[in-house]
Amino acid sequence: MGRRPKEAIQKSIPSSENGPRVTHETASGQIYKVTENLKTKKHTLWKNLDGGWQKLKSADSPYDLYELIDYDN
């Protein structure tokens, strides 16, 4: 099994992610956003990095993405 290459950093979240956006901030200040594409009904987790946003994963439900956020427990 090969590893998937990391997603490229995008300057902004694509306009196709046109549904509600929920921002999560960890104790260390790392910012994540969960977005929704209203056409496909898919939710996507994005991580804020210097220079833009990195797409981490897409899922049918936003609840499937929350476990990927490191809340600095």
Stretches with model-predicted labels:
Residues 2-26:
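Negatively charged, low-complexity tracts enriched in Asp/Glu with abundant Ser/Thr
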Residues 6, 23, 33, 55-56:
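Intrinsically disordered, low-complexity, compositionally biased regions/tails
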Residues 31-52:
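Short aromatic-glycine-(Arg/Gly/Cys) micro-motifs in beta-strand/loop hairpins
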Residues 19, 43, 50-52, 57-73:
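A short, charged, amphipathic alpha-helix used as a generic interaction element across diverse proteins
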Residues 3, 26-29, 65, 69:
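Generic low-polarity alpha-helical segments
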